[in-house]
């Protein structure tokens, strides 16, 4: 395993533990005497005015639209690297996790629709349980230390990256509001400029980020979700230049600590603070939260394991070396941790609707993700080899 992937896994695992702490603090504040302080923090108005450009949003939306664009920039960089040189490079490497990820997105969505397909409003949340929180999942896996085979970590990483790519496509196709053609036209010009810079071998990361900032503003104004700008910029930054430098790798290396230790925990803190005031048992067991929780805890492992097993049995893909189906099943349960990505989709799906829908969807996400984390960890402990003890040689 390359040093890049090792460092990635270490930072994701540590970041996952910080995520848990941030979410717990948010829940405590939202349900204590500090609720007002918590809400006031999220409502802080932040404005940027440059000439005729005026963007005014509360801090919560700057986190969701702005900082999360940086997260998706890193996702774009990661996906490009893995597709060209990493765990997804070549058909043989990519097929198994790709098929597993497809099953892990289809089954949860279908299960959610079994619960909520008849309701025109809650039906919009069908993609909520389709997401996997890679940082959280790797954080739980890290608790088992060196008992986890490298191949299993890489499988989870590859599966989650493909899952992220699927979520990006879902956001672009299904969670886009009314579109401004003028803003989209300028955005298209910015994308064309980025592509030209890539073709010409421009190696200055700052040039891509400057054009990317223009792209982010245009996409924000267009009605398409602004986080997509981050993915596009990530794909456009060259992996290698003529002088053998890697602008993409350098930027990913620089961004990763900020994303793992600040941006994602801040997103979790801003979005996980669900007030339980007014929450009833009947509401908690209603179709919306139950559809999400069941989709995450049952749908994810059902889809990932079934598609993986069929792919191997039909000869479409090969099981990675030194990994068995018991371990695949345990990891597939762990992939039911949707958390930040699921909360992000829920905020898009129920934007402008009854606040109760957002509240109960978050509770469903927390219920499903927590159950998946506990059961997934327990299963991994059972199926992984015992920790090797050091032997003193005299």
Swiss-Prot record:
It is a multi-pass membrane protein. InterPro entries: Na/H_antiporter_dom_sf, NhaA. Its main location: membrane. It is found in: Cell inner membrane. It comes from Yersinia pestis. The lineage of its organism: Bacteria, Pseudomonadati, Pseudomonadota, Gammaproteobacteria, Enterobacterales. The gene is nhaA. It holds the Pfam family Na_H_antiport_1. Belongs to the NhaA Na(+)/H(+) (TC 2.A.33) antiporter family. It catalyses: Na(+)(in) + 2 H(+)(out) = Na(+)(out) + 2 H(+)(in). It comes from the Bacteria. GO terms for cellular component: plasma membrane. GO terms for molecular function: sodium:proton antiporter activity. This is Na(+)/H(+) antiporter NhaA. Keywords: Antiport, Cell inner membrane, Cell membrane, Ion transport, Membrane, Sodium, Sodium transport, Transmembrane, Transmembrane helix, Transport. PANTHER family: NA(+)_H(+) ANTIPORTER NHAA (PTHR30341:SF0), SODIUM ION/PROTON ANTIPORTER NHAA-RELATED (PTHR30341). Na(+)/H(+) antiporter that extrudes sodium in exchange for external protons. The chain crosses the membrane at residues 14-34, 59-79, 95-115, 125-145, 154-174, 179-199, 213-233, 254-274, 292-312, 328-348, 363-383. One of its GO terms (biological process) is regulation of pH.
């Amino acid at each position: 395993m390359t040093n890049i992937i090792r460092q990635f896994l270490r930072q994701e695992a540590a970041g996952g533990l910080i995520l848990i702490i941030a979410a717990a603090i948010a829940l405590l504040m939202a349900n204590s005497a500090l609720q007002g302080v918590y809400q006031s923090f999220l409502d802080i108005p932040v404005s940027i005015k440059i000439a005729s450009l005026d963007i005014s949003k509360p801090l919560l939306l700057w986190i969701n639209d702005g900082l999360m664009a940086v997260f998706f920039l890193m996702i774009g960089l990661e996906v490009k690297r893995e597709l060209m040189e990493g765990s997804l490079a070549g058909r043989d490497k990519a097929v198994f996790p790709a098929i597993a990820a497809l099953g892990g997105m289809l089954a949860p969505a279908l299960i959610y629709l079994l619960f909520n397909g008849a309701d025109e409003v809650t039906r919009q949340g069908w993609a909520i349980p389709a997401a996997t929180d890679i940082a959280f999942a790797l954080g739980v896996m890290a608790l088992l230390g060196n008992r986890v085979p490298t191949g299993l970590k890489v499988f989870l990483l590859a599966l989650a990256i493909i899952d992220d790519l699927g979520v990006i496509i879902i956001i672009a196709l299904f969670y886009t509001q009314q579109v401004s053609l003028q803003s989209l036209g300028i955005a298209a010009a910015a994308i064309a400029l980025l592509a030209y810079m890539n073709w010409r071998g421009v190696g200055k990361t700052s040039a891509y980020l400057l054009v990317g900032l223009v792209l982010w503003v245009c996409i924000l104004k267009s009605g398409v979700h602004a986080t997509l700008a981050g993915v596009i910029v990530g794909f456009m930054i060259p992996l290698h230049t003529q002088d053998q430098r890697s602008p993409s790798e350098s930027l990913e290396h620089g961004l990763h600590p900020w994303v793992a230790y600040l941006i994602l925990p801040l997103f979790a803190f801003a979005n996980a603070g669900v007030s339980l005031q007014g929450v009833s048992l009947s509401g908690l067991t209603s179709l919306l939260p139950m559809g999400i929780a069941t989709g995450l805890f049952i749908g994810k492992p059902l889809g990932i394991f079934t598609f993986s097993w069929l792919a191997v049995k039909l000869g479409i893909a090969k099981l990675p070396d030194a990994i068995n189906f018991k371990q695949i099943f345990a990891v597939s349960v762990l992939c039911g941790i949707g958390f930040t990505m699921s909360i992000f989709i829920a905020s898009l799906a129920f934007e402008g609707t009854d606040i109760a829908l957002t509240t109960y969807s978050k509770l469903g996400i927390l219920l499903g993700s927590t159950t998946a984390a506990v059961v997934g960890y327990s299963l991994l402990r059972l199926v992984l080899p015992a920790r090797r003890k050091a032997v003193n040689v005299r």
